[in-house]
Swiss-Prot record:
Region (Disordered) location: 742-774, 819-893, 999-1019, 1033-1059, 1097-1116
One GO CC term on file: plasma membrane
Comp. bias (Basic and acidic residues): 840-850, 878-890, 1006-1017
Family per similarity comment: Belongs to the TMC family.
Residue ranges that the UniProt entry lists as topological domain Extracellular: 170-192, 247-319, 383-393, 531-570, 641-680
Protein known as: Transmembrane channel-like protein 3
Organism listed in the record: Mus musculus (Mouse)
Expression sites by tissue: Detected in most neuronal organs and also in some non-neuronal tissues.
Glycosylation sites: 264
Top-level lineage group: Eukaryota
Main location class: membrane
Gene that this polypeptide is encoded by: Tmc3
Pfam family, one: TMC
Membrane topology: Multi-pass membrane protein
Amino acid sequence: MKTSKASQRYRSIRRNASQCYLYQDSLLLGNSDDSFNADETGDSSDPEQIFQNIQFQKDLMANIRCRPWTMGQKLRALRRAKEIVLKFEGRLTRTRGYQAAGAELWRKFARLACNFVVIFIPWEMRIKKIESHFGSGVASYFIFLRWLFGINIVLTVMTGAFVVLPELIAGQPFGSTASKTIPREQITSAQDLDTVWSLGGYLQYSVLFYGYYGRERRIGRAGYRLPLAYFLVGMAVFAYSFIVLLKRMAKNSRTSLASASNENYTFCWRVFCAWDYLIGNPEAAESKTAAILNSIREAILEEQEKKKNKNMAVTVCLRIIANILVLLSLAGSIYLIYFVVDRSQKLEQSKKELTLWEKNEVSVVVSLVTMLAPSAFDLIAALEMYHPRTTLRFQLARVLVLYLGNLYSLIIALLDKVNSMNIEEAATKNITSHWADAPTFSATRTVPEEGQWPTPGSGAELRRNTSTWVVEETSFLTSITPHTKANKTVPYMQGPQGQCWETYVGQEMLKLSVIDMLFTVASILLIDFFRGLFVRYLSDYWCWDLESKFPEYGEFKIAENVLHLVYNQGMIWMGAFFSPCLPAFNVLKLIGLMYLRSWAVLTCNVPHQQVFRASRSNNFYLAMLLFMLFLCMLPTIFAIVHYKPSLNCGPFSGQEKIYDIVSETIENDFPTWFHAVVGHISSPVVILPAVLLLFMLIYYLQSIARSLKLSSQQLRMQIQNARSEDKKKVAQMVEALAIPSDARQAGSATEAESSENSKPKTLQARIQTHEESSKRLLKDSDLISQLSSVYMATSPNNGHMLNFDSLSSKSLRMEAITRSLPQSPGQGSRDPCSPLLDGSRSRPEQDTNRHPHRPCSSTSNLHKNRSCSSVTQTQPLKDVRSEPLSRKDFQPISPPFCGSGVSTLMTHDHSPRAPRYYVVNERDSHKKTHRAFWPERHFKIDALGDIVELYPRNVQQYMSWVPNQPCSPQLSEEEEEMLRRDLVQWSIPASSLTDLPRSSCFYTGDRSENNTRDPKYQRRVYYRSGDNSFEDQLERPTFVHRKPRSRNGQYPQHALKARVKAKFEPSFTESDSVSAASSSDHQNSNNDQYLHVMSSQGRFPRSASQLGRRKAKSRQVLPTDLNDLICSNV
């Protein structure tokens, strides 16, 4: 028979796949030696075959690890695949080969470049080693330190390239101006230890501090504007820090959103998939092992914290007490720092010379408070019983508040001193102007013979009283002048030297940073190193175990150390404007801190008892750093805006405000129109709407962020639900594989018992859903779920109904239409509502019990007792097929009707027959209709007298109606032959069938005229009762049964399997599989009913008005809703 294009393509694919499989076996699994020649494999003149072989070899090389072969077979296969690709790929195109080679070369180069770049990442291997032994929480501290190191490198480059180097290269040299010259009274003590320690002497008059830089607007030949650069760089330090922090936080937020909030299969991933098989170094293997163990400990702790039960009343009370203690500690530290700063100011006013402790007591007290208070907070946090990660965050917040309180108390005290210095400077300026207006005295003397004489002069000393300033002349002979200068008139004008408050603030910030570094080194050596030595070497000689009890080995305190970095960076931001070299000093400090801390951790510290996983993004650290940056920027901005710059030092001397340098530069160095534009932009008319617009934009973006966060949570929940549904489906599949065998056994036992006790009296028409491919599911989803009741219009059966249901394929629910026969005397009857699963899962050999042996016995009350059985299908019905059962022992009553279109078995028109119900699948006229569930049938009578069904030419196989089941098992061969003759002779009188109800037949098909046959061409078969009491024309209903599971796919009762082409399969829907049996009176036997199944997008049936809009056809259509169908003459 002629096959279709799809069949040809399928066979071609199967043939190519088998050839490819044979080629794989011969190439990959063949045991050949090294003398393998690539010319013997894949050598062909066909370009398509060459391309297929090359493509296969590439796929093999890409998926060689997934092959279930030994390593030797994999290596041989990989070697041969490379040889074939290198040899034959050039036959197709050399450009593709060059591209592939270039891509491979670039991939190798990129990998080498990445490995080379890793070498330049500072302290990468050191951090990995720490992470493997101490966990990600401790490693996060060092990663954070490295990131701060990078920020300070950039800040150092900015200040050094634009401020420090131009001043050193093009500025005035040291000693040329008063701001760059050490006073004479300080020269002798400029190199003393206490002077250097207090950052005085030569350090004070150097590029380290603000006062050294000159006030010239342009320096050098290029006319570099140093004052403007100094101001812009100071603002750029804050701007760059803000931008970097926000970008890093946004990147970490995206990373944390991309990853799942809670990990699935945590322990499985860590146990089975955590090892890195590329490790070749024993030390790296040891570190990786420690890292895996530590991650498992972290996961175990996470699970334990989820299941921990707490007494909330006691916990709340302890937390309240802990917070009260923390507040008292914070208030006490702030008061102590402010008291020390105020005391130092009073000492400076009362004493001329201060001791070393009095000069540095402020920095020492601040460092002691910042070092001891976090330990007290750590002890207090033990009362709260939080999760370790939550405890860390509370500890970080408290220490942050402590550090901010210390810094602000220090800066407030410093600004108070700046106010007093400005008052003194204003008073000094007034006195200097008074001396400038006074007359100039001159003294003339004869030169003595000794060659020298004392020069008259005046020394002035300022003394502050309550309301006036008094100048007292103490002496007039202050120095000895050589006689060569004796006869000159020397004018004298001298006032008190002004002080530079910007340099003083920079000195205090740098001094605080230096002392903090020293205290950090001392705490590491004392608390960690010497403590570890004491515990290790004296534990054997002590009264108790020093390793498990006090003092034991030190633990790395993450919160304290992280906040120490934040505090240190805050000092840098606060003092960078007054000390341009402070970021460079911080770079050196961070380098030393990295090496010292890492050494102490690996040598002296032990892992924390409660190891916990650090946050994925570390945004909490960055948020604290951002908060610190904002609060440290405020004092600097306040000083720039509020205080007047010093008169005798700095690049802004002579200005009313520091920011006036910008307006002065715009006025003098830019065109007039630019100055006008800047003036309009800086006016309140523009600034206020811009600020409002920014607030609106921030609110809009925040709303979008909230909505995106909510949507991401919903999507994550959907993913989790999908995973749970997949798990349920897998469980159902496992149960479905286990159920059929048990169901078959139970069904066979039930059927055997029923056959022994009683004969079945129930004719059932079962409707089973069919689960098809995904494309078919999309089409089936459009088929509505219809439910109707057919009321029998015969006089004794009004009100009785047959229910049949057509459900969508997504619901595994079936409706069984049953008709119960009356019980014979002395026989039991089966339950008419018996479950469908028992019958559908029975073996094909046991189908004799499913169909009645005597369908026509005692049929006078056949129409009674109808019921509907609703059964839920619990397993997928992928192998369900509806086929007509074979019928035996009946002959055609007339020769086949010969026609061009239809040839069926039929009877004379005058004989009464039962009404037929055609279940028609209604489709639109513009859609292409498919064939019905079964193709149009053609019958003939073979030589043996059996009915043979002929399929059309496009059907690949025939199905012969061979004897399957005897109508009456009590008949012998002679009686069967007699039955055949009686059926042919038309020996049944019509009057004997008056009380016999006819069986209603349900047919499936499309509305199209060429697919639905006329009722008069339908097959008619005569039956005779078992006891020969009557004979009649009856239509046995078509049964839908489950396809048996067999390896060869053949039914045991059929000689040939009915194979229909795949293009007929899409027409198999729920509505097409309906077949049922019903009864009617002989008065209504000449009318056939059509049940239309409408295909629509909705879930509910169409109304009668919608059905009436369809085009009327040549047959009779029920115009009402399916729930009101009446089986009567319409």
